[in-house]
Each structure stands twice: as C-alpha cells, then as structure tokens.
Amino acid sequence: TDPDADEGEFLAEGGGVR
C-alpha cells in the first residue's frame, strides 16, 4: 500500500503509479 510500491503491490492494492 506504499505510494512507491512495485507493480505487484500496485496491481494488488493499488499502491503507487508505476
């Protein structure tokens, strides 16, 4: 859930824009 998360977290929890 980090604003600078990786693709995995980005797609899973919608973290950062990567």
UniProtKB/Swiss-Prot annotation:
Conversion of fibrinogen to fibrin is triggered by thrombin, which cleaves fibrinopeptides A and B from alpha and beta chains, and thus exposes the N-terminal polymerization sites responsible for the formation of the soft clot. The soft clot is converted into the hard clot by factor XIIIA which catalyzes the epsilon-(gamma-glutamyl)lysine cross-linking between gamma chains (stronger) and between alpha chains (weaker) of different monomers. Forms F13A-mediated cross-links between a glutamine and the epsilon-amino group of a lysine residue, forming fibronectin-fibrinogen heteropolymers. Its main location: secreted. It comes from the Eukaryota. GO terms for cellular component: extracellular region. Keywords: Adaptive immunity, Blood coagulation, Coiled coil, Disulfide bond, Hemostasis, Immunity, Innate immunity, Secreted. Coiled coil: none annotated. It is found in: Secreted. The keyword Hydrolase does not apply. One of its GO terms (biological process) is innate immune response. The keyword Aminoacyl-tRNA synthetase does not apply. Cleaved by the protease thrombin to yield monomers which, together with fibrinogen beta (FGB) and fibrinogen gamma (FGG), polymerize to form an insoluble fibrin matrix. Fibrin has a major function in hemostasis as one of the primary components of blood clots. In addition, functions during the early stages of wound repair to stabilize the lesion and guide cell migration during re-epithelialization. Was originally thought to be essential for platelet aggregation, based on in vitro studies using anticoagulated blood. Heterohexamer; disulfide linked. Contains 2 sets of 3 non-identical chains (alpha, beta and gamma). The 2 heterotrimers are in head to head conformation with the N-termini in a small central domain. A long coiled coil structure formed by 3 polypeptide chains connects the central nodule to the C-terminal domains (distal nodules). The long C-terminal ends of the alpha chains fold back, contributing a fourth strand to the coiled coil structure. This is Fibrinogen alpha chain.
